[in-house]
Amino acid sequence: MKLSTQTEYLGARFGEAEAIRMIAKAGFDAFDLSLFYMNSQPQHPMNQSEFREYAKSLRAVADECGIKCNQAHAPFPTSVGDEEKDEAAFALVVRAMEAAAIVGAEMIVVHPKHHLSYRTHARELEELNLAFYRRLLPYCEQFRIKVACENMWQHNREAGRIIDSTCSRPQEFLEYLTKLNSPWIVACLDVGHTALTDEDLPAFVRTLGKTQLQALHVHDNDLRADLHTMPYMGKIDFATFTAALKEIGYEGDFTFEADQFLAAFPDPLAPAALDLLHKVGRHLKTQCE
């Protein structure tokens, strides 16, 4: 099990190459390449014709630092309900898959479509998503990279609270994967999202099981908002979570998505904050093994 964290905040602040160097220097085994800026930043290097060369340059930095890209995160949202925009989003996901594979990732997290109200359109969303992930399969085989579906949430603006969305319930998530029936499509369990939708986190782990659960997004929150902060800064019970991972014999990596913790610190303290995140990760990782 590798200990990993994402490049998102450090990459935006210091550049992606330097983010990789910082993550390696802090002692992490791997990094999660954040590619979700591709849909909001047309000038991003991954959106240019030379994106393959840029991806190779990041791979060279990683190799020089002795660190691996264990997974990546594709651009999102993957749908807004407009055919032209959704096709453009699909093309970005495919490009992200290729770029991630070049950098060395064996897996990329791809959000399911959930632009419709889940409460009234759950079946329609399921049909859209099964077609969406099946459409990605040829690219999985071409680039030799797995796609990890993630459990989501929606926001009820009228009530001012978070509610269920695609794959937020463990049985539904498992049914998605069973129907897709491909070794290329697996589960990424977002720990924070699970807490926000009132799910029993250890039970979610056990329901997905060792075969389907192959990636994690680990972060903490106050059970009310998607804070993406470091474990032990919020209210999630990480002792029962790590015990469940150990129980099922989890064989994936332990990947943080806790960059809002890092965001609170000024530049000179970023390495120290990253070092603390690493130490917390090592502690949690030992509880899983």
Residue spans for each PLM region:
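Histidine-acidic metal/acid-base catalytic patches
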Residues: 1-4, 9-29, 63, 106, ...
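Active-site-proximal loop/turn and secondary-structure-junction residues that shape catalytic pockets
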Residues: 9-11, 35-37, 75-78, 112-116, ...
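Residue-level preference for nonpolar/small residues embedded in alpha-helices
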Residues: 15, 54, 92, 131-132, ...
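Glycine-rich, proline-tolerant flexible connector loops at the mouths of alpha/beta enzymes
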Residues: 32-58, 226
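Short glycine-enriched, charge-decorated loop/helix-capping segments at active-site entrances
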Residues: 44-49, 85-86, 162-163, 228-232
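Active-site acidic/histidine proton-transfer and metal-coordination neighborhood
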Residues: 56, 60-68, 78-186, 196, ...
